[in-house]
Amino acid sequence: MSRTVEQSVSSETYGFDAIRGTQAGNEFYVAMCPLKIIPKLFSFNDHDIPPQLRAQRVLSAARIPAIKNYILNNPNDYIFSSLTASVDGVMKFTPAASLGEEGKLGRLYIAMESRLLINDGQHRRKAIEEALKEKPDMGHEMISVVFFQDSGLKRSQQMFSDLNKNAVKPTKSLNILYDHRDKFSKFVVDLTSEINIFKDRVELEKTTISNRSKKAFTLNGISDATRHLLGITKNRKLTSEEQEITREFWKLVVKYISEWNLLLEGKISSADLRKEFVHGNTNSLNALGIVGRVLIKEYPEDWKEKIKRLRDVDWSRTNPEWEGRLLLNGRMLKNAVGVELAANTILQKCGVELPEDRVKHENKNG
């Protein structure tokens, strides 16, 4: 460029309010960028380039609609973390005049001819572009972008690796607990305080329970089982009737599983319950949910009578009927087919002749 960055601000550079910082001995900048400029700043043309010559993964188109809809459906409370980008070109920070040359607040100028690479956030960037097509007035809202000076392909690849390898996805239970926007999740969380066996006995953060824990169930297990009960695959707001039948179902299950009553009476610990019996495991809860759905569908008038037979079920781990269904060589089995088969076993114990669509699971196993 024939002119300095400052001289060409109006026509040849982007300018942003920014904060300057130092990390690992290198300067970086956090800038506030209008959403409408994000698609212009960052473009993608790496699809045909071999992975070893790229510094980011290929964009997954399947992820974009969900993120776009999240923005559009929550215009008053969506939130995005910062994008992280490398600038291959001229970039200069000018501190605010009142702060002197060492000032941390100022303006960041980036030459328009620079190549900007997103190290973290390319799916958010694409979703923003798609959302703006439907709602362009959101273009004046801001997102923070962390800018680093590009130090070559190897460094950019390392940045991508470092930013992603230590990221830990929240557990399913924690997502349910914290998702106040999702009505189904909120209902399930409320269940944990409404149903006596669940109260103070549900692991709300993890999807597994440690051997010495006082918890007997997991939040994700109750959520999955409730979806099986209602026959829904995606979370949605439940009708008042669905909510009531769910509460009624779980209360009856508690009433007719004798070991759960021992737990309520303090005659057995949660640890011993999990150690000696199968009915606190997520797969067992799912099987119970399926049982409830079948009973309510096939016996709408007297399903409550049928469910009383749960008290006749031998839930102990030593019961050979659970082998290949909830257990494999004595260890809990994590298998969708096993859940269906366990549901069949419980249904038969409840005096139900298996419907044709249930028999097929036995045939597959046979």
Regions found by a protein language model. Name each.
Residues M1-G366:
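Accessory terminal alpha-helical modules
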